[in-house]
């Protein structure tokens, strides 16, 4: 799959514009999403419903608030767990905007509704191994 992406500054907001071609599905795609700045200079993309097919068929896309202190990342949301892995894009500025795929490992008490308060969990980059730990973990 070929992907072309760029970070675009639009006023105070930052967006990711991505164009690509999925050889397996023989379809091209294009999307623009809000890019959440991260303490390490990268960006986290939220609400990826429109481009779920471009991230290994995973349609899981939670919305959350991101707060940081001294380089740590503090997540203050309850995420909806799904049977599929939770995947995110992380854009690192080192050497240009490279797409990093993040997987979420979570441990918590499942409720009947499928929700869980994630007590111990972390984000790790599958390419460079960067870990984003919630404060107090």
Swiss-Prot record:
Domain of life: Eukaryota
Name assigned to this protein: Putative FERT-1 protein
Name of the gene encoding the protein in the UniProt record: FERT-1
């Amino acid at each position: 799959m070929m992907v072309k992406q760029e970070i675009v500054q639009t006023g105070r907001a930052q967006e990711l514009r991505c164009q690509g071609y999925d050889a397996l599905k023989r379809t091209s795609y294009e999307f623009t999403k809000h890019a959440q700045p991260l303490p390490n200079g990268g960006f986290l993309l939220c609400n990826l419903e429109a481009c779920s097919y471009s991230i290994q068929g995973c349609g899981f896309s939670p919305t959350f608030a991101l707060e940081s202190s001294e380089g740590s990342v503090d997540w203050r949301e309850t995420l909806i767990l799904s049977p599929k892995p939770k995947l995110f894009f992380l854009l690192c500025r080192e050497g240009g905007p490279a797409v990093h795929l993040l997987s979420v490992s979570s441990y918590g008490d499942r409720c009947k509704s499928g929700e869980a308060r994630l007590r111990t969990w972390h984000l790790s980059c599958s390419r460079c191994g960067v870990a984003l730990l919630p404060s107090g973990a």
